[in-house]
From Swiss-Prot:
GO terms for cellular component: cytosol. It catalyses: L-alanine = D-alanine. Substrate binds at R129, M303. The keyword Isomerase applies. Belongs to the alanine racemase family. Catalyzes the interconversion of L-alanine and D-alanine. Provides the D-alanine required for cell wall biosynthesis. It is an enzyme of class 5 (isomerase). InterPro entries: Ala_racemase, Ala_racemase/Decarboxylase_C, Ala_racemase_C, Ala_racemase_N, Ala_racemase_pyridoxalP-BS, PLP-binding_barrel. One of its GO terms (biological process) is peptidoglycan biosynthetic process. The modification N6-(pyridoxal phosphate)lysine is found at K34. This is Alanine racemase, biosynthetic. Pfam families: Ala_racemase_C, Ala_racemase_N. Pathway: Amino-acid biosynthesis; D-alanine biosynthesis; D-alanine from L-alanine: step 1/1; Cell wall biogenesis; peptidoglycan biosynthesis.
Length: 359
């Protein structure tokens, strides 16, 4: 009998990278593995994707873990560096870095490095989070081209705010700003992440940066799943029944007695709870799979246990397998039921959840 376990399907991960190459055949792939590869395991994910052209991370520590784990492909620091003292390490490890503000640019100009750094100038085209404003961008770009510590040519990167919406005027405006600035400049270009890859083929350019879709999860909020785009779920959150109980009509279950049975039935108790990262907000009716059969959660999610209504004729027994999301039950459905985004669901699992990798 197993308690909370994440099963990561390496074959599905490799399939998804190939599928994304089919969707963006002229672009190179930055496989985004920040936040422990969206909960899938940083090193194991990178090692499963030797055909990725580069890897994208949010923190220098993540990049260093990749290098220490034997990953030699280019690694892009998507948020840039946070401290000028990190520049010698970035140079020595041949990391690529975003540069998005005056402080970073000044640090590059003042640094003493053995080798120049590959830079991606971040242009704020409308996300208004990181990046150089368009009216300041030409002067900023010129300084990068003159900086001895910057490997030439300077590359240009931006990020969509609403790429998960088809036919979005804001995205069209961002794309126009990006195209205007990049015109005539020799560096590589990248603006498309998961939503851009799926919905905005005109944004693919030299590099694309698949994040959540690489793991088989749709970035869209339209009830689509990764399968709608030819991708397969990589993560399955699994557990087991630890008890099966007879339950009488009119009896409540769990804290607060929020669910009362309308029939005699059999209840299963699953070794899973918010202590594992499963959302406490999951309402009664949220589906799980028991022996491949969909059954509803009943009552409140507790720290360590969830109750499910197996039905009056159920033959399930303690030790039988349970899938909370993944193969056969898309995490996007759980996100819709719980009002917790799929991004958060897959990255919030706690350290007591075991990790298992299969091919």
């Amino acid at each position: 009998m197993q308690a909370a376990t994440v099963v990561i399907n390496r074959r599905a991960l490799r399939h998804n990278l190939q599928r994304l190459r089919e969707l963006a055949p002229a672009s190179k792939m930055v496989a985004v593995v920040k936040a422990n590869a969206y909960g899938h395991g940083l090193l194991e994910t990178a090692r499963t994707l030797p055909d990725a052209d580069a890897f994208g991370v949010a923190r220098l520590e993540e990049a260093l873990r990749l290098r220490a784990g034997g990953i030699t492909k280019p690694v892009l620091l998507l948020e840039g560096f946070f401290d000028a003292r990190d520049l010698p390490t970035i140079s020595a490890q041949h990391f690529h870095t975003a540069v998005h503000n005056e402080e970073q640019l000044a640090a590059l100009e003042e640094a003493s490095l053995d080798e120049p750094v590959t830079v991606w100038m971040k242009l704020d085209t409308g996300m208004h989070r990181l990046g150089v404003r368009p009216e300041q961008a030409e002067a900023f770009y010129h300084r990068l081209t003159q900086c001895k510590n910057v490997r030439q040519p300077v590359n240009i990167v931006s990020h969509f705010a609403r790429a998960d919406e088809p036919k979005c005027g804001a995205t069209e405006k961002q794309l126009a700003i990006f195209n205007t600035f990049c015109e005539g400049k020799p560096g590589q270009r990248s603006i498309a992440a998961s939503g851009g890859i799926l919905l905005w083929p005109q944004s693919h350019f030299d590099w694309v940066r698949p994040g959540i879709i690489l793991y088989g999860v749709s970035p869209l909020e339209d009830r689509s799943t990764g399968a709608d785009f030819g991708c397969q779920p990589v993560m399955s959150l699994t557990s087991s029944l630890i008890a099966v109980r007879e339950h009488k009509v009119g009896e409540p279950v769990g804290y607060g007695g929020t669910w009362i049975s309308e029939r005699d039935t059999r209840l299963g108790v699953v070794a899973m709870g918010y202590g594992d990262g499963y959302p406490r907000a999951a309402p009664s009716g949220t589906p799980v799979l028991v022996n491949g059969r969909e059954v509803p959660i009943v009552g409140r999610v507790a720290m360590d246990m969830i109750c499910v209504d197996l039905g009056p004729q159920a033959q399930d027994k303690a030790g039988d397998p349970v899938i909370l999301w993944g193969e056969g039950l898309p995490v996007e459905r759980i996100a819709e039921m719980t009002k917790v985004s799929a991004y958060e669901l897959i990255t919030r699992l706690t350290s007591r959840v075991a990790m298992k990798y299969v091919d």
